[in-house]
Amino acid sequence: MSDNEKSTQTEEPNFRYNAALAQDIENKWQKIWDEQGTFWAANVNGDLKDGKGRNAEGRTAYFAMDMFPYPSGKGLHVGHPLGYLASDVVSRYHRMKGENVLHAMGYDAFGLPAEQYAVQTGQHPRVTTEANIANMSRQLHRMGLSFDNRRTFATIDPGYVRWTQWIFSRIYDSWYDEDATNPSGSKGSARPIAELVAKFESGEKAIPGHESDGKQWSDLTDAEQQDILNDFRLAYISKSPVNWCPGLGTVLANEEVTAEGKSERGNFPVFQRELRQWSMRITKYGHRLIADLDGINWPEKVKLMQRNWIGESHGASVHFIVATADGDKDMEIYTTRPDTLFGTTFAVVSPEHHLLENVPAEWPADVPEDWKGGYANPVEAVKAYRLAAEAKTAKDRVNEAGEKTGLFTGLYATNPITGAKLPLFTADYVLMDYGTGAIMAVPGGDQRDYDFAVKFGLPVIYTVTPLPDSGDDLANYEGKAPFVSHDGIVINSSVEATEAKGDALSLNGLRVDDAIAKVNAWLESAGVGKGTVSYRLRDWLFSRQRYWGEPFPIVYGEDGTPHLLPDSALPINLPDVPDYEPRTFDPMDAESNPEAPLSRNEDWVKVELDLGDGKKTYYRDTNTMPNWAGSCWYYMRYIDPTDTKHMVEKDEFDYWMGPNHNKYSGDEGGVDLYIGGVEHAVLHLLYSRFWHKVLFDLGYVDSAEPFHKLFNQGMIQAYAYTDDRGQYVPADEVVEGPADASGEPTFTWNGEHANREFGKMGKSLKNIVTPDYMYENYGADTFRLYEMSMGPLDESRPWNTRNVVGGMRFLQRLWRNVVDETTGQAHVTEDTPDEKTLKLLNNTIAEVTAEMEGMRPNTAIAKLIVLNNHLTGLKAVPRAAVEPLILMLAPIAPHICEEMWSKLGHAESLSAEPWPVADERYVGHDTVTAVVQIKGKVRAKLEVPVDIDPADLEKQALAAVADRLGGKEPRKVIVKAPKIVSIVPAE
C-alpha cells in the first residue's frame, strides 16, 4: 500500500463533528442570533417593544434570571456557569412553549471585591472592572447563553446609579406607620415622611420630647425638626455601635461578619465601635419578612435561614427606673420571660449604653471591693471598661465559654413589680445593638446570669420549679446551678397591692405560658410595660468608608443638618480621582478611626447649591453605599434599562412581574425563576425583599415579593493535588497510575508521588478549568451538555474533564444520524417510523417534558441518549423521529441542534419552534427491554410485557441464550422482572 493510500484512509471526513467543527458551528449561530435578535423579549411599550415579530400581545410572560456576577477577577472557571446554564436551558424551553421570555444578564460591579482587585493590580477600579466585564461578557456569550443583550447593564453605569440613589431617596423620605394598612391588607406600611410631618403639625401625633411643653411643630428649628424626623426615617443617621474592621478600613454589617468575629472578606478582626453611620430600619419589616415567606416558592432551608436570622420572639418590654444625680432615667429592657421578673436580682447594660453617661462621681456606701474593679470611682471604672470592651470582637464578647467580666456602675434600678433596688452593672456580654442594650438578670433561670451572680456574690432566686410529673426536682439545682426551662410551675412570684406598685399580682402555681400572659396584662395596666415582639435582626448598617460605591444623595449644611438632594441632581457620580485606596490600619488597631477616601477630595465635597432658600455652602456625604445597594433592585431594571423616566414603568412591571402575570407565580407575582447560591440567603435576598416591600408600600411596584421561585444550584467541585511537601501542583499535569494495594488509584506529578484531595475549584488550588479551555477542546455544546448531565442541579458534583468525552460522543452519534460526514448533507428518510420507534419517541417526549418542567436536565439527557441509541440501530433514521429529538435537545446543546435543523431544510431558527407534544396513542410503557446476563455480561435483550410473570421471563431468557449454555442446566438463575435475568452457568 502506498503512502498516499495510507494517508487517504486515515484522513477524517470533512464534516465529522469534532472540536474544530463545533467551534465553527457555534460562532456561526451566535452571530446569527445576535444579528436577528433571536432572544429579544418584547415589552408592552417603549423602546424594547420590538420582539422581532414575536410581540408581547397575547403571549404569556416568563421572567427567568440568575444572581448576576461580580466582575472582580480575571474571568470564569467551569464551576461558575452552572446556574447560568440551568437558567438558559429553562429559558429556551419556555420560548419553545410559545412564551415571551425575559432572560438577561448584568454585572454587580460596585463594592469591596472590585475595589480590592483594583488595589492588587494597581489600577483604578473603573478600569479593571470594565475590563473584567468585557472578558466575562465574552465568556458568557461564547457559551451560547440566550440573553436579550439590549437589557445588559452594570451597577456602575451612571443611568443605573441614578435610580439606586433615587430609591435611597424614597426610603430616606419615608417612615413606617404601624397603624397604616399596606397594599396587602395588613397593618404597618411605609408612608411618605410628609404624612408624619402633617400629623405633627395637626397635633394628631405627639411630638417626641415635647409632649408636655406645649411646643408646636412650627416652633421648632429646622435642625430640631430634622433630629426628630431622623428617629422615624427608614434610612437614618445614628451614632451607634458598629462593626469596625481596621484591616479593611471600613465598617461592616452584621451579615458581613463571621461567627468567629472576623470579616467575611479577608478574615480580619472586627471590633465594636460607636460611630456615626447610615442605617436602614429593616427591623420594622421583621414580621412581614417572616410571614410572607409562606407565599413564595423557595427552598425550605433558605426560608428557615431567614426566619432564624430575623429571629422573631414574643415577650415584653419593661421599664425600670434608674435613679441618677440628673433625676430618674428610664431603662427599657426586652425579655422573652417576663414571668421571671420576680427573680431579677440585678440588671446589666452594655458598655455603650447611654445610662453610663450618668454614673455617680463616687462609689455608694458599702459597695463590695470586687464590684469596683480596682477603680477609685465609677467614672474611671466605666471609662476603662468601655475601652477594654472596644478592643474585643463581638464574638469574644458573647462567647459563652469565656470569662464573665463586668463592674458595678454605682447606679441602681427599681424592679417595677417588686420595688426592689437592683444594682446596675455593665458587662461586655450585653451588646448595644441587640435588644435595648440592657437586660434584667435572673440567675435562677439563666446560666450566664448565674455565673455572673456567683462571681459577684449576688443573690439567686428561683421562680420556676420542674413540672410534677417530670421526674426532676428543684433541689437538684438550688445552690448549684440555674433551672433553665421554658416550662414548669411558677413559684416565689407574688406581690401585695400597694399604692406605689399598683394591684396585687401572683403568678404562683401557674404554668410558664399562663404566667407570661398574666404578667404582661399587669405590666400594661400598671403603665410600666407591655407584651411585644422583638427581633434578632438588627437595622441594616448602610454606609461604608470606601471609594468604589454609590455616593449618597445627601449634603450637610454648616450646622450639620442633612439635606436630600432633588431628583433632578441625580446621579451623583464618583469623582475620577487617583487616590481611591481606602485607609487601612493594623488589623488589631481597635482605636483607629475610619477615613473615607472621598473626604480627601475637597473640590468634590464642598459645593455651592440652591436648595430652595438661596445659594449656600454644603458638604457632600463622603461615605458610599454598600455593594448590596445595586443588587437590591437590579431584577426590575432588566424590564427596561433604557427607560429614563421611571425606575420601572408600571404597565411593564405588571406584565413581567405583577400578580397573576402567569400561572407560575400566581397571585403573588415576582420573578418567575431566580437561580443562585444559598450563600446569599441572609444578605442579598433579605435586603432585596426589604427594599421591594418599601417600594410596594409606596405604590411603585405591585407585587409584595421580588422573587416568586428561588432555586439554589449546587457547587461544582474538583480534585486538587499536592506534592509530598503539601504544595499544590497543577491538576492538568498530574498523571493517574495503577491502583495500589487498597484498590485506590495512584498519582504522580513530574515523576514524583502526588496526593489527591477533593473540594473547591480555585486558582490557589491549581485545579481551575476555564470555559475557554472547554470551548477550544470540546466546543460549547459539549461543555453545556456535560454540566447539565453531571447530576441533579441542586446538588454539588465533582468535575472530571476525562468524563466530558462521553457527551461529545453522544453529540457525534446524533450528528451522524442526521448528517453525512462526507458530504455534510442531511441523510434521513421520509418514511413513517415503525411502531416500536413511535412508542419510544412519544414516551421520550412525555418523559423529557416532565423532566424539563421539574428542572432535571440530567435525567432528560439520559432519556434522549436512549432514543438516539435506538435511532442509531435503524437502517435509516426517520425525519419524523429525529426532528423531535433535535428540538428536545436544543435547550441544552443549541448550536449543533440549530445546524442540524438547518440541514434538514428549515429556514428559521428552531429557538421559537413549538416544543414537541407526545401523541397519547403511543404513550405508556406496555413493553420493556429485558436484559439477559451470563456471568455479568449481556448476552441477549428481549422485548417483554411490563407485567410479565417471572417464570415466563425465565423461560424466554433461557431460550434466548440456550446455545451459550451448551445444553446444560444453569447452576443459578436470578430473575428481577421485568428488566433483568442473571444466569450463573454450570461449571
From Swiss-Prot:
GO terms for cellular component: cytosol. Disulfide bonds: none annotated. One of its GO terms (molecular function) is leucine-tRNA ligase activity. A motif ('KMSKS' region) lies at residues 760-764. Keywords: Aminoacyl-tRNA synthetase, ATP-binding, Cytoplasm, Ligase, Nucleotide-binding, Protein biosynthesis. It is found in: Cytoplasm. It is an enzyme of class 6 (ligase). A motif ('HIGH' region) lies at residues 69-80. It catalyses: tRNA(Leu) + L-leucine + ATP = L-leucyl-tRNA(Leu) + AMP + diphosphate. One of its GO terms (biological process) is leucyl-tRNA aminoacylation. ATP binds at residue 763. It comes from the Bacteria. Its EC number is 6.1.1.4. NCBIfam families: leuS_bact. Belongs to the class-I aminoacyl-tRNA synthetase family. PANTHER family: LEUCINE--TRNA LIGASE, MITOCHONDRIAL (PTHR43740:SF2), LEUCYL-TRNA SYNTHETASE (PTHR43740). This is Leucine--tRNA ligase. It comes from Bifidobacterium longum (strain NCC 2705).
